[in-house]
Amino acid sequence: EAQRRETWDELCDRNVAMHVKRYPQLREEIQRIYRDFVRPKKVLPSMRSLQFGGTPIELSESRIFNCAFMPLDHPAAFHEAMFLLLGGTGVGYSVQARHVNKLPGLTEPAPGTYRFLVGDSIEGWGDAVKILLKAYFNGKSLPRFDFSGIRPKGARLITSGGKAPGPKPLKECLERLQAVLERALARGTGTRLRPIEAHDMLCHIADAVLAGGIRRAAMIVLFDRADEEMLTCKSNLACTMQRTDCINHDAELYECDITTTSNGKDYHNVVLHSSQLAEWKEKGALPWYLFEPQRGRANNSANLLRGAVSQNEFYALMERVEASGAGEPGVYWTNNLDWGTNPCCEIGLKPNQFCNLTEINADDVKDQTDLEERAGAAAFIGTLQAGYTDFHYLRP
């Protein structure tokens, strides 16, 4: 309404008001901490707390946390990831076999169909993913998604700010999720998703979030170091050309049908520049992002158990990283293969745990006493944030 951005003091006022409403008995201490530490930027709350402080967090308290980690060991993990990412929370996830193998086997959807009106909310988008997956994990009928209730592209988002993406990103996401599920089901009823397939599904979900106007989806995936598909999912792909038709002589663009050598997967109508065709003729391979661009939505790291990897095995893995030409995968050293991390790898997280973040500005710390006072203020704010636990859309 004022046609300007929120000031720092206004943002702090909004944050204070939210905490005082939750903890009225701590009003004076909250106001003191913000006056002495947050307003002068000696200590900062979580970034999501600053961004969404007030009504957005009161409606969906998971939004106060910057990041989370979850193993993909339950069908609910997929729609929960959509919900969290749309709310601005980054997601780390595991597609290690020990987790993905706990997903139910796939089954043919039941005959018939029904109309499903997609809700115009982050819960509504999550529900659309949930309903689609129920058809393949639980044998329910496939829905006919009705997107008429979703605000058109460019409409103002009242609660969280920004502009609505319209229904197109979600529609494309659901189509791509279904394509992954159908390809997996072609192996036979009862087959389970491979780690690379579960990973691709999360990346397609992130693509919808990327277009959703909240913020770019932040993700990291952890996988078994022996998983060849995950290890090479950001490497150049050996392939054969089935068709190359010039579609623009001036721009030197060609429309191609391509088959990857590793798994025989067909890609149709891929547009390549003449220089890329020349690269293929020389190397017999093309960059991964021409085939599976959604994989760019996550950082990839092999999960390595401390004490269980020899020096030679580690060097061999690093040679694969160099050969990828993409600088990935990274490695994540751990003492527990069921634990994970947030996308920035700042903290180890248990399954389905949030990262409760505060920051201390160490740039202008004067002495030990000053540092300890800032640490106390940061701990106080972190304790306030830890009390926001009404995760109404997530599993208990």
Where are these regions (language model features)?
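Extended catalytic cores of very large enzyme megasubunits
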Residues: 1-396
